[in-house]
C-alpha cells in the first residue's frame, strides 16, 4: 500500500516518480510527511519547484525529519520556497491526520 490519496495516472513521468519517492521512504514518518505534501501540491508545482522538491527527496530521511521538527537547523541549500512550503504544510498544534 502506497498511502497516496491521488492517482498517478494523469501525471507526467517526472511527477509520477516524485510521488512514488515521496511515499516510499526509509522511514514511515517521512512517507507521511512527504507523501501528504506531494498528494496536495505535486500536480501544481512549477518546473523550478519540482527541481527543489526532487532535491528534498534526495536528502537523508533522518536529516529531513530533524530539520522539520526543529531538532537541527535547516541548511542553506535546503532553505528553499518548497521546503518552507513543506514545513508550513505540517506546522500545526494538533496531531497529523494519517
What do the PLM-derived regions correspond to, one by one?
Residues 2-98:
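Positively charged, polar, low-complexity stretches
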Amino acid at each position: 500500500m502506497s498511502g497516496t490519496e491521488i492517482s498517478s495516472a494523469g501525471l507526467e513521468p517526472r511527477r509520477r516518480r516524485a510521488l512514488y519517492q515521496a511515499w516510499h521512504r526509509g522511514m514511515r514518518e517521512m512517507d507521511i510527511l512527504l507523501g501528504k505534501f506531494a498528494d496536495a501540491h505535486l500536480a501544481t508545482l512549477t518546473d523550478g519547484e519540482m527541481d527543489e522538491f526532487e532535491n528534498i527527496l534526495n536528502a537523508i530521511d533522518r536529516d529531513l525529519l530533524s530539520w522539520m521538527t526543529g531538532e537541527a537547523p535547516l541548511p542553506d541549500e535546503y532553505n528553499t520556497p518548497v521546503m518552507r512550503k513543506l514545513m508550513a504544510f505540517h506546522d500545526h498544534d494538533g496531531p497529523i491526520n494519517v
